[in-house]
């Protein structure tokens, strides 16, 4: 997806809040915007 691995790591190594879809750091326990605790890792591959 990205042109070089550093950019891909910056874009894809995040967690997504299941409540408000905010981007959070990988080591986050709760969402930085809404405080929700259910976070998922961002999908690494496209569905299409």
Swiss-Prot record:
Listed InterPro entries: Ribosomal_eL40_arc, Ribosomal_eL40_dom, Ribosomal_eL40_sf, Ribosomal_zn-bd
Keywords in alphabetical order: Ribonucleoprotein, Ribosomal protein
One GO process term, biological-process aspect: translation
GO cellular component terms, A-Z: ribonucleoprotein complex; ribosome
GO molecular function: structural constituent of ribosome
Pfam family, one: Ribosomal_L40e
Family: Belongs to the eukaryotic ribosomal protein eL40 family.
UniProt cross-references to NCBIfam families, sorted A to Z: PRK04136.1
Protein's recorded name: Large ribosomal subunit protein eL40
Species this protein is from: Methanospirillum hungatei JF-1 (strain ATCC 27890 / DSM 864 / NBRC 100397 / JF-1)
């Amino acid at each position: 997806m990205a042109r070089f691995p550093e950019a891909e790591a910056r874009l894809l190594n995040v967690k997504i809040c299941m409540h408000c879809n905010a981007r959070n750091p990988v080591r986050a326990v709760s969402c930085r915007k809404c405080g929700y605790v259910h976070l998922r890792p961002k999908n690494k591959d496209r569905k299409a």
